[in-house]
Each structure stands twice: as structure tokens, then as C-alpha cells.
Amino acid sequence: IEETDYTKDGSVKSVHKYKLNSEGDVIEETEYDGANKLKEKKEVKYNSLGEKSEEVIYGSDLKVTKKHVFSYNNQGLKTEKKTYDAVNKLISSKKYIYSYQ
């Protein structure tokens, strides 16, 4: 799948290319600028239940810039998102809490 964004004058602003797995989930997203130079690449992994478990983000040099790791509860609700830097050091952790009425 390919998606192109244009500026007001009609020139190409950016191009996003997507690769999907057999379930239709995005497993790779690549973004190029208007000159067709790589800006960013994302690779996504899913667990056995089809939930996004990991997202690795690469810069224009194809070196890892950050990684997100996701956790879920037994109901399939996201419970945590951990973000790591280029050297795999934890830089943030976000917990999700759900309340039911």
C-alpha cells in the first residue's frame, strides 16, 4: 500500500509505503520526503493474539532511534507502553488503567 501527501502547489510532500501481514496488519511503514529520500522506517511485531507487541523506529540512516514495547491484560486491553532509546535504555513508561461504570 502506498500513500502520497501533496503540498498546496501539487508537489509531493511525502510518501508512505506500508507492508501488511496475512491478517492485514501493518508490519512495516516507510516514509520518504518529497525528494524520495528516506525519512523514517517502522517495523511492527504482533503477539499470538494479534496485538501490537513491539514497534521499532529507524531514522534515515536505518539505525534504531527508539523502540516501543506494549503489554496487554487478559481482556486484550493495552496496559503498558515502554519506550527505549537507540541503545535500548528505558526512557519512558506509560501505564493504562481502565475503569468500568
Please annotate each region the language model reported.
Residues 1-101:
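Buried hydrophobic residues that stabilize the cores of well-folded domains
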